[in-house]
């Protein structure tokens, strides 16, 4: 893979490489299989402008929707969400590397790496045609804030200007972090002084329309997750960032707005080099739970934003 990344660095335009279903072969929490933290760090070290992230929500999540009399063509483990049935399951439809607060994703962000998440259908064969997949965009979506050009989309993916969502829980998300002088959004870095008062503004759309399942899920809560950036770590297998946690939970009752258009504000203080990211769900679960076999994917929906960084300056 490193040879391939070195070759790709010479291409014009350069591609974007995303690690797919990174924990499908993991046997336990933080006991990884074919894809390890060390391997993903090597990719990012070799080509930080190409190997920029991983699949947060894997595809293959429609197996449970197949007709009961049409299940003999696949082994039982395939019917877990994401086909994660041979080891550690998905959590709210997301890979453990993304879903666990203070886990691998936060370890990468805590090193200051610009390491982003995406979601896709991995659509081989639709579940109505004998497969276990949704059509592209039917269930999982990656929203990219970009000019509608090939170059613009690749540039924004490299820069982390993306959020991911399942089941059309939300259809728009804007994040602005400001110290009163400078404002930044996803993937960007706010350079500010120690002790600066910061304002985080979240604009979100919870659509008043049905998704592909004919349902209209309600966004129940948004979580603000923050962690410290402490720099590169010697342990290349590190998959934890103990500084990361949920610092605020905003319930639907506290949303300001009408007709599904909501604005949420939070006041913060710049006290450490760090980052913040958002997560939301239609469930009452404080954290995404391990997905059991037989779960209806449309009932357990989440969104995740990519992070905004804070860098303290003199």
Question: What kind of feature is each model-predicted range?
Answer:
Residues 1-74:
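Extended substrate/RNA-proximal surfaces in nucleic-acid metabolism proteins
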Residues 8-15, 89-96, 101-314:
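C-terminal functional module detector
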Residues 28-33, 84-98:
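The substrate-binding groove and active-site-proximal loops of carbohydrate-active enzymes
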Residues 41, 52-54, 81-82, 86-88, ...:
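Catalytic pocket-lining loop regions of alpha/beta-barrel enzymes
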Residues 68-91:
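A solvent-exposed, charged loop/short amphipathic helix patch at secondary-structure junctions
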């Amino acid at each position: 893979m490193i040879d391939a990344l070195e070759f790709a660095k010479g291409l014009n335009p350069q591609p974007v490489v995303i690690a797919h279903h990174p924990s499908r072969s993991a046997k336990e929490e933080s006991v990884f299989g074919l894809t390890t933290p060390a391997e993903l760090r090597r990719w990012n070290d070799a080509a930080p402008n190409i190997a920029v992230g991983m699949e947060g929500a894997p595809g293959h999540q429609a197996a449970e929707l197949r007709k009961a009399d049409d299940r003999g063509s696949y082994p039982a483990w395939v019917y877990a969400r994401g086909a994660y049935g041979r080891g550690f399951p998905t959590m709210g439809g997301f890979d453990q590397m993304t879903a666990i607060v203070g886990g691998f994703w936060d370890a990468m962000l805590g090193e200051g790496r610009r390491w982003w998440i995406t979601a896709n259908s991995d659509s081989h064969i639709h579940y109505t045609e004998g497969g276990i997949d949704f059509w592209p965009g039917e269930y999982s979506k990656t929203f990219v804030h970009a000019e509608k050009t090939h170059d613009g989309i690749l540039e924004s993916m490299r820069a982390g200007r993306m959020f991911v969502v399942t089941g059309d829980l939300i259809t728009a998300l804007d994040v602005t972090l400001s110290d009163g002088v400078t404002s930044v959004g996803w993937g960007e870095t706010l350079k500010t002084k120690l002790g600066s008062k910061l304002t985080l503004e979240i604009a979100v759309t919870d659509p008043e329309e049905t998704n592909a399942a004919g349902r209209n899920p309600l966004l129940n809560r948004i979580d603000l997750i923050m962690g410290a950036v402490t720099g590169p770590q010697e342990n290349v297998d590190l998959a934890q960032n103990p500084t990361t946690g949920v610092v605020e939970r905003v319930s639907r009752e506290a949303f300001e707005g009408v007709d599904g258009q909501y604005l949420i504000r939070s006041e913060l203080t710049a006290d450490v080099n760090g980052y913040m990211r958002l997560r939301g769900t239609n469930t009452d679960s404080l954290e995404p739970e391990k997905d059991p076999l037989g779960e209806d994917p449309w009932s357990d929906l989440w969104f995740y934003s990519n992070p905004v960084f804070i860098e303290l300056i003199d």
